[in-house]
From Swiss-Prot:
Membrane topology: Multi-pass membrane protein
Keyword Cell membrane listed: yes
Function: Required for the insertion and/or proper folding and/or complex formation of integral membrane proteins into the membrane. Involved in integration of membrane proteins that insert both dependently and independently of the Sec translocase complex, as well as at least some lipoproteins. Aids folding of multispanning membrane proteins.
Transmembrane segments: 6-26, 350-370, 424-444, 458-478, 499-519
SUBUNIT field: Interacts with the Sec translocase complex via SecD. Specifically interacts with transmembrane segments of nascent integral membrane proteins during membrane integration.
Family from the record: Belongs to the OXA1/ALB3/YidC family. Type 1 subfamily.
Biased composition (Low complexity): 29-42
Main localization, broad class: membrane
Organism encoding this protein: Salmonella paratyphi C (strain RKS4594)
This protein's name: Membrane protein insertase YidC
Keywords: Cell inner membrane, Cell membrane, Chaperone, Membrane, Protein transport, Transmembrane, Transmembrane helix, Transport
Length: 548
């Protein structure tokens, strides 16, 4: 099997994978808003079962730090809007990326509070608490490392509930602390809760284009427990009322999208119930409810939880909660993508340019795989040397396919040739290629990362299609330089058009991925010449016998 035939095999595998990915995406379509018109649900694990209230109207206060710009509703203390000043909405835009939003077109909120028998957020106790706040705007001043936003509510019995948001400079993790002061004569039973709710359907202004030519990043819910480190939960599963209902000591719940995430991390010193809920009107939720805490008369009890609202920065997320960094969507090849990203990030710490880092990592990967590449070309050379014997065998045995197969395998064994030896190294490269794709599409560090000249975003396609064309040219040169024994006219035509077909495929791929493939092809050309020189000395290759 020669290199051009191997190329055809890889192309077929590649196209088959694309079709499979597209089918996976299409067979689980997102539910349409009009299909979920109910306003409540009583499914197991629903928000109603957990005693989690609906949103209400209150005064909006703003909180600004160096990395967050939040809007909090004093009715319940929910975060209804979150802007990320460090991340523009689009490349070259001065408008910050909006993660949380509350508009008629789209809802994405981070709710929290105190429910349970005596909790002010328990629907059975009336409307959600209307907190008192000292001022309408809070700003983390220059030189200030921490900002506290206290909100206080006193119920009819005189019990005081204080909810304090604690922000730190440069941090996307927000501590939400609760203080319950019991001024009555009976114990108070309260439970902290945290809930994320979001509209299933994306309006046009929220579509980030995370689906790219059949490969797409995950948008949905997720959770983590000590037993299940990371589990995705699709929005359409929640909309179908197939709800989550598990108890866990520790862990977290989250909502994910390309590059960004929100997550509630409760305290791990008690048992928490994780749930999902279909809230109706095309809105779904995931949340937690902590085990009840008894506050004795005359006593004050403190509780806390943490909200992550921001980019999926892996090292910072890992420091907030175990396995929270797994929310970075590297797909089913995460075990390859994660080491690749760590290596890429290490290289970037020296180089300072993600594009040059990709070039260097390409040389490293291809260098590591050089022994396999050499074995591949050696195997193909031996196969070419056997072609006269194989052809004579076919003529001698005629239509006896069984005898042909038996004698061919005996010939391979005698000559110590593996007929699949030329294919295996190329098949190994395909997972690396796809893992790099997921890494480019899932790592926030590569979002809007420039390279050079006209490439201003390595995670987006080349706007002028120059890189895909260069990739096609390098592929054409590899094809022309590779010996072939293909005689079938149809296969020859397919081989001729293969660079064109791949160029068309790569038009929509991230430019960082195309850059990797171009450099990989250039390395292939260099390695090819070195290997052929060695094979010539062994009598396994002749440039004169090369067919174009």
């Amino acid at each position: 099997m020669d290199s051009q035939r191997n190329l055809l095999v890889i192309a077929l595998l590649f196209v088959s994978f694309m079709i499979w990915q597209a089918w996976e995406q299409d067979k689980n379509p997102q539910p349409q808003t009009q299909q979920t018109t109910q306003t409540t649900t009583t499914a197991a694990g629903s928000a109603a079962d957990q005693g989690v209230p609906a949103s209400g109207q209150g005064k909006m206060i703003t909180v600004k730090t160096d990395v967050l710009d939040l809007t909090i509703n004093t009715r319940g203390g929910d975060v209804e809007q979150a802007l990320l000043p460090a991340y523009p909405k689009e490349l070259g835009s001065n408008e910050p990326f909006q993660l949380l939003e509350t508009t008629p077109q789209f809802i994405y909120q981070a709710q929290s509070g105190l429910t349970g028998r005596d909790g002010p957020d328990n629907p059975a106790n009336g409307p959600r608490p209307l907190y008192n706040v000292e001022k309408d705007a809070f700003v983390l001043a220059d030189g200030q490392n921490e900002l506290q936003v206290p909100m206080t509510y006193t119920d009819a019995a005189g019990n005081t509930f204080t909810k304090t948001f604690v922000f730190k400079r440069g941090d996307y993790a927000v501590n939400v602390n609760y203080s319950v002061q019991n001024t009555g004569e009976k114990p108070l039973e309260v439970s902290t809760f945290g809930q994320l709710k979001q509209s299933v359907n994306l309006p046009p202004h929220r579509d980030t284009g995370s689906s790219n030519f059949a490969l797409h990043t995950f948008r949905g819910a997720a959770y983590s427990t000590p037993d299940e480190k990371y589990e995705k939960y699709k929005f359409d599963t929640i909309a179908d009322n197939e709800n989550l209902n598990v108890s866990s000591k520790g862990g977290w719940v989250a909502m994910l999208q390309q590059y960004f995430a929100t997550a509630w991390i409760p305290r791990n010193d008690g048992t928490n119930n994780f749930y999902t809920a279909n809230l109706g009107n095309g809105i779904v939720a995931i949340g937690y409810k902590a085990q009840p805490v008894l506050v004795q008369p005359g006593q004050t009890s403190a509780m806390t939880s943490t909200l992550w609202v921001g980019p999926e920065i892996q090292d910072k997320m890992a420091a907030v909660a175990p396995h929270l960094d797994l929310t970075v969507d590297y797909g089913w090849l995460w075990f390859i993508s994660q080491p690749l990203f760590k290596l890429l990030k290490w290289i970037h710490s020296f180089v300072g340019n993600w594009g040059f880092s990709i070039i260097i990592i390409t040389f490293i990967v291809r260098g590591i795989m050089y022994p396999l590449t050499k074995a591949q070309y050696t195997s193909m050379a031996k196969m070419r040397m056997l072609q006269p014997k194989i052809q004579a065998m076919r003529e001698r045995l005629g239509d006896d396919k069984q005898r042909q197969s038996q004698e061919m395998m005996a010939l391979y064994k005698a000559e110590k040739v593996n007929p699949l030896g030329g294919c295996f190294p190329l098949i190994i490269q395909m997972p690396i290629f796809l893992a790099l794709y997921y890494m480019l599409m899932g790592s926030i560090e590569l979002r809007h990362a420039p390279f050079a000249l006209w490439i201003h975003d390595l995670s987006a396609q080349d706007p002028y299609y120059i890189l895909p064309i260069l990739m096609g040219v390098t592929m054409f040169f590899i094809q022309k330089m590779s010996p072939t024994t293909v005689t079938d006219p149809m296969q020859q035509k397919i081989m001729t058009f293969m660079p064109v077909i791949f160029t068309v495929f790569f038009l929509w791929f991230p430019s960082g991925l195309v850059l990797y493939y171009i450099v990989s092809n250039l390395v292939t050309i260099i390695q090819q010449q070195l290997i052929y020189r060695g094979l010539e000395k062994r009598g396994l290759h002749s440039r004169e016998k090369k067919k174009s």
